[in-house]
A protein has these predicted regions:
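Transmembrane beta-strand segments that form the barrel wall of outer-membrane beta-barrel proteins
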Residues: 110, 291-296, 483-494, 505, ...
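Outer-membrane beta-barrel translocator/channel fold
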Residues: 303-304, 331-340, 544-599
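Extracellular beta-sheet/turn segments enriched in Thr/Pro/Gly and aliphatic residues
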Residues: 85-113
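A short, solvent-exposed loop/turn motif at the edges and junctions
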Residues: 44-46, 71-83
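Short, acidic Ser/Thr/Gly-rich low-complexity loop/linker segments typical of extracellular
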Residues: 47-58
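Structured extracytoplasmic
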Residues: 102, 107-259, 265-274, 334-493, ...
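Structural motif
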Residues: 23-37
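Repeated loop/turn-to-beta-strand initiation elements of outer-membrane beta-barrel proteins
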Residues: 512-519, 545-551, 603-607
Length: 611
């Protein structure tokens, strides 16, 4: 009952979202050359919400009236802070131009034995790695994910086979989802998908899973999306010095913090490693952001090149969590070329730290004291003690986490476009808008009665060959109704008891708009030698698909094999009896009435009763 109430409330909130947001701030983010900064971050710390701009640089924030400090961030550019006051029902156009970050690099003595200044910083970050790996004791947040894949080049032929004309350059997959993600140590996840949208379909559910794109460089081995069998070595892994070289490219100031920009360089081209940059915050030695790349040289499968960009921000309790993740990829195979991206935005964090506040200062002071000589190559690892938080309170009930990892609202794919427009944090590009419009138009056409009737006229044509091989089906696609009969070899049989047997069966099925369905199967049987008539009927009803609930009632007087698994098929027995003069079929007359009920009560657990 609580679950139903929750989903009802969420749907009401979504439908009323135009009234909830009283003001809009929107604009475009560009660089000094007025080129769009795709997927730049926009963040309001006081509200714990944010967004990213789209591929064309446009962003949009829907907020209540008030005064806010808005941060505009893009890796490699100076963070810009804008204070904005908005009134109720006001729309403000705020275009932003970000300047390239000017990195400062202190003078260092260069000699044959000196190491790059990046190494002491990396050692400090490695020493704190486990602290930050186990830092979030539990959290909940909202996650918006958008995925897009497009073809840019289509070959004329693949392995001498002509490519169909309907396969052409353009978007081939576009999806959005809005979920609530919950986490508790150790590695307990539970996700509720509230809304889902797939271009060209109002029935499909998005494959987006927030828990599946967890990309955590505090782990020794990173393998988000299962990009290869081994995973990839983190640049902060305990043995990362075996795989990487490091170079300090400079430092910059942001909100009173000093951030180091460190280039990570693979020692061997074909190791499962990253290339790019990692940004580390001075004194706390946390990850500030990442700008990484992996390619086929690193052993990545399915795609050619993958770019990973992350931004972190401080949440309640001092815990830093990712607020945005972007996976931008390029692919090429058999002459096809394409690209795409998945962007994940995290908002409304509720976090609880594993450690009391004084734990951080003690550990950080200890590390700083151990490294008074910057070139030292030995740093004591922090011994992570998984201490309880200040209180034993928790966000979740004891039974909240179970075998159910992903729950999908029954109406997740029914969210209307107007609602999506009000809750979507990343504006759609003109290309994406056109894709939704075109594919929705095609879908509406394909779901229309004239179109379905035209298909039925072709598919319902009677064919004697099919009647002998697979039977015959007559369908009303628009009404989602079908009538089917068995193939001839199942209707006409022969056995030594009944002689020639006539055994017709009619299967009637109907599916409704809410995906419930029923099936009615009347069947009769007449043996010419025994001169006996038998009959039975079976009725099944599935009111919904989420829990695979199924009601079934059957009964009648019919011929049944002694082995209930029916190991001998009618056509096989008829052939043996008529051609080999051998009969292996053993049957008896069965009169019965049966009712059954089945339902999944938990993930992997099904309840069934029958009488």
């Amino acid at each position: 009952m609580k679950t139903i109430t929750f989903y009802t409330l969420m749907c009401c909130l979504l439908l009323c979202s135009n009234q909830l947001f009283a003001a809009i701030i929107k604009g475009r983010i560009v660089n000094e050359n007025n080129a769009p900064l795709s997927f730049a971050n926009v963040y309001i710390k006081s509200l714990n919400i944010g967004t990213t701009c789209n591929d064309d640089g446009f962003y949009e924030l829907k907020i209540d009236a008030g005064k806010y400090d808005i941060y505009f961030q893009y890796i490699g550019y100076k963070t810009k802070l804008e204070s904005v006051s908005v009134k109720k029902d006001e729309t403000i156009l705020l275009n932003i131009k970000l300047e390239s970050e000017k990195y400062t690099l202190k003078e260092v003595d260069v000699n044959a034995t000196a190491e790059d200044p990046a190494y002491p910083i990396i050692r400090q970050a490695m020493a704190m790695r486990k602290v930050y790996l186990f830092e979030p004791k539990e959290y909940s947040c909202n996650v918006y994910i958008k995925g897009m894949q497009r073809l840019t080049t289509v070959p004329k032929r693949v392995l001498l086979i002509k490519v169909p004309p309907e396969i052409k350059p353009g978007i081939i997959y576009l999806t959005e989802s809005y979920s609530e993600l919950n986490y508790q140590q150790p590695e307990k996840f539970k996700e509720k998908m509230i809304s889902s949208k797939v271009s060209g379909s109002n029935k499909a559910f998005s494959f987006n899973r927030a828990s599946a794109i967890k990309f955590n460089l505090y782990e020794n081995i990173v393998n988000s999306y299962k990009l290869n069998e081994r995973g990839f070595v983190s640049p902060l892994a305990s043995d990362a010095f075996l795989s990487y070289k490091y170079k300090l490219d400079g430092e910059f100031k942001e909100n009173g913090l000093t951030v180091f920009k460190i280039k990570i360089i693979p020692k061997r081209e074909h190791d499962p490693v990253f290339r790019g940059y990692i940004y580390i915050v001075k004194d706390s030695w946390r990850i500030h952001s990442t700008d990484l790349m992996i390619s086929k040289l690193s052993g990545v499968e399915f795609i050619d090149t993958l770019y990973i960009k992350q931004n972190y921000a401080e949440q309640e309790g001092g815990v830093w969590m990712p607020v945005s993740q972007r996976f931008i990829f390029q692919l090429e195979a058999y002459g096809f070329r394409g690209n795409g991206y998945f962007v994940a935005l995290y908002s409304k964090y509720k976090t609880r730290s594993m450690y009391p506040n004084e734990f951080y200062s003690k550990q950080q002071n200890k590390i700083i004291a151990d490294q008074r000589v910057p070139e030292t190559k030995k740093v004591e690892r922090v011994k992570v003690v998984k201490r309880k938080a200040k209180t034993d309170t928790t966000f979740f009930d004891k039974k909240f986490f179970n075998n159910e990892l992903l729950a999908i609202d029954k109406k997740a794919n029914k969210t209307v476009d107007a609602t999506w427009d009000s809750v979507r944090p990343v504006p759609l590009t003109s290309e994406e808008l056109l894709d939704y419009k075109q594919k929705d138009s095609v879908r509406i056409l394909e779901e229309s009665k004239p179109y379905m009737d035209s298909l039925d006229r072709v598919n319902n044509k009677f064919d004697w060959a099919n009647l002998f091989i697979s039977g015959y089906t007559f369908g009303h696609s628009f009404y989602k109704k079908k009538y089917s009969i068995k193939p001839i070899y199942s209707i006409i049989q022969y056995n030594t008891v009944e002689g020639l047997v006539f055994n017709p069966e009619l299967r009637i099925s109907k599916t409704f708009d809410d995906y419930s369905k029923y099936e009615l199967v009347p069947e009769c049987r007449y043996g010419f030698a025994s001169n006996r008539v038998y009959g039975r009927i079976n009725f099944s009803y599935e009111p919904e698909q989420f829990y695979y609930t199924r009601w079934n009632v059957s009964g009648g007087s019919f011929v049944q094999q002694f082995n209930g698994d029916v190991p001998i098929t009618p056509i096989l027995n008829s052939a043996y009896t008529l051609l080999a003069k051998q009969n292996y079929l053993k049957e008896f007359q069965k009169e019965y009435i049966k009712a059954s009920f089945g339902r999944n009560i938990l993930n992997g657990v099904r309840m069934s009763v029958s009488a």
